[in-house]
Amino acid sequence: MYHALVEGRPEHSEGTDSSWLVEDKHLHVKRVKSTFKGSKQSITHWRIEDQDEFVSLIEINIETGRRHQIRMAMQFLGCPIVGDTIHGAATDPLNRICLHATSLGFTHPYTNDFVQYESNIPFANRFKTDSKPER
């Protein structure tokens, strides 16, 4: 699970971005049609966790793991991630891209146990919500 602070307010409270992305030899990512040679599907689920008149805190879950997938999805939504000037953000008040992995899990390669790590949202203090991700 990821959390992002985005500029503006999405039109809907939740949604899914399903798109096709392609990388060039310089690792730049573009949104393309599914028939474009080398394109890969990208599926991003999101929901608004909190918002004010300027920014929204978005919870994000991905089905695929494409380079810049979340950044491209938020840009297409019309709400670029705060600090992500490459993908359309007009603001960078924290001198960083406000995208953070709040929960990561994987099967341990030696024990085969499922291991999960969680962390606080470093920019959640923008709101009056707890900085722990909701479960």
Per-region residue spans from a language model:
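RNA pseudouridine synthases
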Residues: M1-R135
